[in-house]
Design a protein with these regions (language model features):
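Generic structural signal for conserved hydrophobic packing positions in ordered secondary structure
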Residues: 1-3, 40, 106
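Active-site-adjacent helix/loop segment of glycosyltransferases
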Residues: 65-144
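Short, flexible coil/linker elements and helix-boundary hinge sites characteristic
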Residues: 2, 7, 131, 144-145
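Short, flexible, basic/aromatic active-site loop/helix in glycosyltransferases
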Residues: 1-29
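A generic structural signal for ordered alpha-helices
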Residues: 17, 21-22, 32, 45, ...
Length: 145
């Protein structure tokens, strides 16, 4: 169980899932899930496509951050409806691979957008903590539903 489940309304642990926000209000946000994006074509012309270095996971976070850095805005729109065929992104089929890919993509995302802002010792600490988180997450697999 992650901290997002223990503290569902805490912005620190739930910013990606937007659980801390009123789901009935349209609002500007720092990012949204790639499974429910509507994007103007002009934005692709401005910033490019999704970054293919992200095989699985974090491609949406990377895209939203690049959108914001280039002066565009990202909105959560509660009335928008999208049919997401399939879902789960393969997480049920191979949970070990999904966990590994999530952590690898998060590492790439951090390295691309944030590592240059910190000194090497902090980055090493961050990478070590991510590795520990990966190992601990693997230990939780038998307890998942």
């Amino acid at each position: 169980m992650g901290l997002d489940k223990l503290f569902p309304n805490n912005i620190l642990f739930n910013e990606y899932h937007l659980n801390h926000l009123d789901e009935n209000m349209e609002m500007q946000v720092s990012g949204i899930s790639g499974s429910c994006m509507m994007i103007k074509a002009i934005i692709f012309n401005d910033i490019g496509n999704f970054d293919e270095q992200f095989y699985l996971y974090q491609e949406d976070s990377d895209f939203c951050l690049r959108v914001i850095k280039s002066g565009w805005r990202v909105y959560y729109v509660p009335d928008a409806q999208i049919i997401h065929a399939g879902g789960e992104g393969g997480t049920k089929a191979n949970i070990q691979r999904a966990i590994f890919e999530w952590h690898l993509s998060y590492f790439k995302f951090y390295r691309k957008h944030y590592a240059q802002d910190y000194l090497l010792p902090f980055n090493i600490l961050f990478y070590m903590l991510m590795a520990i988180k990966l190992v601990l997450t693997y230990f939780t697999i038998p307890f998942r539903k």
